[in-house]
A protein has these predicted regions:
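Membrane-interfacial, low-structure loops and terminal tails that flank and connect transmembrane helices
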Residues: 31, 35-52, 194-202, 241-277, ...
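Short helix- or helix-capping micro-motifs
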Residues: 152-160
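Signature aromatic-anchored transmembrane alpha helix within multi-pass, membrane-resident enzymes
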Residues: 427-457
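Structural signal for the C-terminal ends of transmembrane alpha-helices
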Residues: 136-141, 186-194, 233-242, 356-369, ...
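Specific aromatic-rich, kink-prone transmembrane helix
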Residues: 176-196, 209-213, 231-232, 236-238, ...
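Intrinsically disordered, polar/acidic, low-complexity terminal segments
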Residues: 44-96, 100, 106, 110-150, ...
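Transmembrane catalytic cores of multi-pass membrane glycosyltransferases
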Residues: 67-124, 130, 151-153, 169, ...
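Start-transfer (signal-anchor) and selected internal transmembrane alpha helices
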Residues: 14, 18, 22-68
Length: 619
């Protein structure tokens, strides 16, 4: 049987039809029908079948590795911060924060014009997107083994700074979609596996696709752009080689069999080409921002979004540099505040080994006969500059805001730095050489220990979040029950357009409610939990009002009048003549709060008598 007969026969077997068409139109035209070519066709078909099995195994392994960290969080089914207010009122609200793609995605999952609680489906979809990116890394970065892809991809998504991102029952999907879009934009521009169809495409098509993905990332979640910046710098840092070494290696791999095995074509990876690639990516980022900023100005609404969306003035250069220095110091403090000693040491070790190897490689892969000293100096200085630029790239354009908010959820570039450094340092022909076998084992060992630490952090966060949510829910019910006994007007119909009650009852919280007993140890010992565990019942906290509304106080609103706030604090609420104590527990111990209606304001006081006495003696 000839190759042409086999191609026609296999055309009826579903997934083999593509291979059959290729063999009929390409292979049969290029080769003479001999037994050697028949064996080549069988090898291509077997390779396709093997790759499909390997891809399924990689996807299942990625789902399992990510699931170890995400399943405990998803099983809690706790509404986190914005989820509570969105569930109560049924509003979307992402468009007001200049995230139209996020709102569009969630409206596709909704029922009409109001948001319906479909949790945990958005979180499950985010889990699937995160796992699927391991396949993209495997296909776009030649030389990566499936195990390294699974491990590196897990380090990208499971970090102490993505706890909030996956905790949101709704926002987890747009955030994950934005991160995946930014990563895909970087990988599309990276030289990877190119087939005959891809080689015939025009050069501008990858850039146009990357620009669209960057715009999608900005419209889903603005900090996702930082992932693209970090991966671009890592690609330049770990992918550039001197022209002499590049030319010699190209001559060594000049046979068709070696090209087929490597799965890529030879392309220039010199320092100059790396600089040109960085300039190209910088131009794409600038173009995406120029397209996005006018859109954001049209969509942004609300005091909070407008306040934190203003840019620094570019007219005063000294003031601009001082503001950038201050913002960078605040960002680094937020970074240190989310890392415990073990995770910080492991992360630092991984980055030092991976980036250090990239910086040291320039002087060890060649000798002076192959590359001039000027090229060596240029390469070393370029690599050092790229490594230093990784620090501001973690926050990207956020540093240019007048009042940036460095929440932990915005530091999504940290995972891209860890996972990208691991995978790009182990990718390629050089990383598989025997001279770097020790480095490979060291990187994989540190990365595995770091992933184990991140699993523990996710487990601690999941349990602490569940305990705190249950504690605040019970506390809100007790407050509302006592308010009804006191005859406070806590219920009122709400307007469906403005989401405000017809008869408002302003709420002022004094003091701070204690944390849940089951969450106190985790809050003390795990910095990531302490950074993300937000107590609702604190002064001037909107989430306290949301908690009370969930317990049945539909008339509650947050008191925003500063003069009324100052008048309510004097005399102290802990004065027995001005408050009504809550009934005690069964054991006879008093409750932790008191409440009263003062000047038309619902005052809830968590201050103890000891704190009030201390406040009285202060000057």
């Amino acid at each position: 049987m000839t190759c042409r007969d086999m191609a026609q026969k296999n055309a009826t077997f579903g997934w083999r039809s593509f291979v059959a068409r290729v063999s009929y139109s390409r292979v049969w035209q290029w080769f003479i029908l001999q037994d050697r070519e028949c064996r080549l066709l069988y090898m291509i078909m077997d390779l396709t079948r093997r790759q499909r099995r390997q891809a399924w195994r990689l996807l299942l392994a990625s789902l399992a590795v990510l699931g170890i960290g995400l399943v405990p969080l998803l099983s809690q089914q706790a509404l986190y911060l914005d989820d509570m207010s969105r569930t109560l009122d049924g509003y979307f609200g992402w468009g007001l924060n200049a995230r139209p793609a996020a709102e569009g995605v969630m409206r596709l999952l909704g029922f009409g014009g109001e948001l319906v609680n479909v949790a945990p489906l958005p979180q499950l979809a985010a889990w699937g997107i995160a796992a699927g990116m391991a396949l993209v890394w495997w296909r776009r970065v030649p030389g990566l083994s499936p195990g390294v892809c699974v491990l590196g991809n897990a380090l990208i998504w499971l970090t102490p700074f993505t706890l909030q991102n996956f905790s949101y029952a709704y926002d987890s999907l747009p955030m994950s979609l934005g991160l995946a879009s930014a990563m895909l934009a970087s990988l599309i521009l990276r030289p990877g596996v190119h087939g005959p169809v891809q080689r015939s495409q025009r050069r501008w098509q990858p850039s146009l696709m990357a620009l669209g993905l960057l715009l999608l990332a900005l419209c889903c979640y603005q900090p996702a752009l930082n992932v693209f910046l970090v991966l671009s710098l890592l690609d330049a840092l770990m992918g550039s080689r001197p022209r002499g070494v590049e030319r010699r290696e190209a001559e060594e791999r000049n046979t068709e069999e070696r090209k087929f095995e490597e799965g890529k074509t030879e392309q220039s990876e010199s320092v100059w080409c790396a600089w040109l690639a960085l300039l190209q990516r910088g131009g794409l980022v600038l173009a995406a921002l120029l397209l996005y900023l006018p859109l954001s100005r049209l969509l942004v609404a609300g005091d909070y979004s407008q306040q934190h969306g203003e840019m620094l003035s570019l007219g005063d250069l000294p003031a601009l540099l001082a503001a950038l220095e201050q913002h960078l110091a605040q960002a680094l403090a937020a970074l240190r505040g989310g890392l415990d000693l073990v995770s910080g040491a492991l992360s630092g070790s991984l980055l030092v080994v991976a980036l250090g190897a990239a910086l040291m490689t320039a002087g060890r892969r060649h000798d002076a006969r192959q590359v001039s000293s000027r090229q060596l100096t240029l390469e070393r200085l370029s690599r050092l500059l790229w490594a230093l630029l990784l620090i501001p790239a973690l926050w990207g354009p956020m540093l240019m805001l007048a009042e940036p908010v460095f929440h932990s959820r915005t530091l999504v570039g940290w995972g891209a730095l860890l996972g990208g450094a691991l995978m790009l340092s182990l990718a390629g022909r050089q990383a598989r050489g025997s001279e770097r076998f020790t480095l490979r084992r060291c990187l994989l060992g540190v990365a595995a220990l770091l992933l184990l630490r991140h699993w523990l952090i996710f487990a601690a966060w999941s349990n602490a979040l569940a305990a705190q949510q249950a504690h605040e829910t019970q506390l809100a019910r007790e407050i509302v029950t006592q308010a009804r006994e006191l005859g406070l007007p806590i219920t009122s119909p709400r307007d469906r357009d403005t989401y405000r009650p017809h008869d408002e009852l302003a709420v002022q919280v004094l003091g701070k409610a204690p944390l849940a007993p089951l969450a106190r140890v985790a809050e003390r010992q795990v910095p990531a939990v302490r950074q993300n565990l937000i107590a609702a019942f604190t002064p001037d906290n909107y989430w306290a009002v949301v908690r009370l509304r969930m317990a049945g106080a539909s008339a509650a609103t947050l008191l925003r009048d500063d003069e009324r706030k100052a008048s309510i604090k004097e005399p102290p609420v802990c004065d027995e003549r001005a408050t009504v104590d809550a009934p005690g527990d069964e054991g006879g111990s008093p409750r932790i709060f008191t409440q009263t209606l003062r000047e038309g304001v619902w005052v809830i006081d968590f201050r103890t008598a000891e704190n009030c006495r201390r406040a009285d003696v202060r000057p």
